[in-house]
């Protein structure tokens, strides 16, 4: 299992467009990928789950990836977060 914490820096947090990008990225992998915020964990492959968290700017989130392609999955998620200027 791979687990990393991120600090959300995007002014709008994880709203519809970045949530869609994260879900699309996560959906490419067979591993279980979860996003945790304020003690609640959701499947990062679910747009409704991600949007339900209401992650705003300045928030700290944890992403866990567990499965056969976990290293590749985490690398892709990190790349998406950084490329889109969402998190540090």
Curated annotation (Swiss-Prot):
Any single GO BP term: phosphoenolpyruvate-dependent sugar phosphotransferase system
Chain positions found as Phosphoserine: 46
InterPro entries linked to this entry: HPr, HPr-like, HPr-like_sf, PTS_HPr_His_P_site, PTS_HPr_Ser_P_site
Superkingdom in the source lineage: Bacteria
Any one cellular-component term (Gene Ontology): cytoplasm
Subcellular location as annotated: Cytoplasm
Keyword Ribonucleoprotein carried by entry: no
Active-site residues annotated for this sequence: 15 (pros-phosphohistidine intermediate)
Pfam families, sorted: PTS-HPr
Keyword field: Cytoplasm, Phosphoprotein, Phosphotransferase system, Sugar transport, Transcription, Transcription regulation, Transport
Main subcellular location: cytoplasm
Location of the HPr domain: 1-88
Ways its activity is controlled: Phosphorylation on Ser-46 inhibits the phosphoryl transfer from enzyme I to HPr.
Oligomer status and interactors: Monomer.
Chain's role: General (non sugar-specific) component of the phosphoenolpyruvate-dependent sugar phosphotransferase system (sugar PTS). This major carbohydrate active-transport system catalyzes the phosphorylation of incoming sugar substrates concomitantly with their translocation across the cell membrane. The phosphoryl group from phosphoenolpyruvate (PEP) is transferred to the phosphoryl carrier protein HPr by enzyme I. Phospho-HPr then transfers it to the PTS EIIA domain.
Assigned protein family: Belongs to the HPr family.
Name listed for the protein in its UniProt record: Phosphocarrier protein HPr
Species this chain originates from: Enterococcus faecalis (strain ATCC 700802 / V583)
Gene: ptsH
């Amino acid at each position: 299992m791979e687990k990393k914490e991120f600090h959300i820096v995007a002014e709008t947090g994880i709203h519809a467009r970045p949530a869609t990008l994260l879900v699309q990225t996560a959906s490419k992998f067979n591993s279980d990928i979860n996003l945790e915020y304020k003690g609640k964990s959701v499947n990062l492959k679910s747009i409704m789950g991600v949007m339900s968290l209401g992650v705003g700017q300045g928030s700290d989130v944890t992403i866990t990836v567990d499965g056969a392609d976990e290293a590749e999955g985490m690398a892709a998620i990190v790349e998406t977060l950084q490329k889109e200027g969402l998190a540090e």
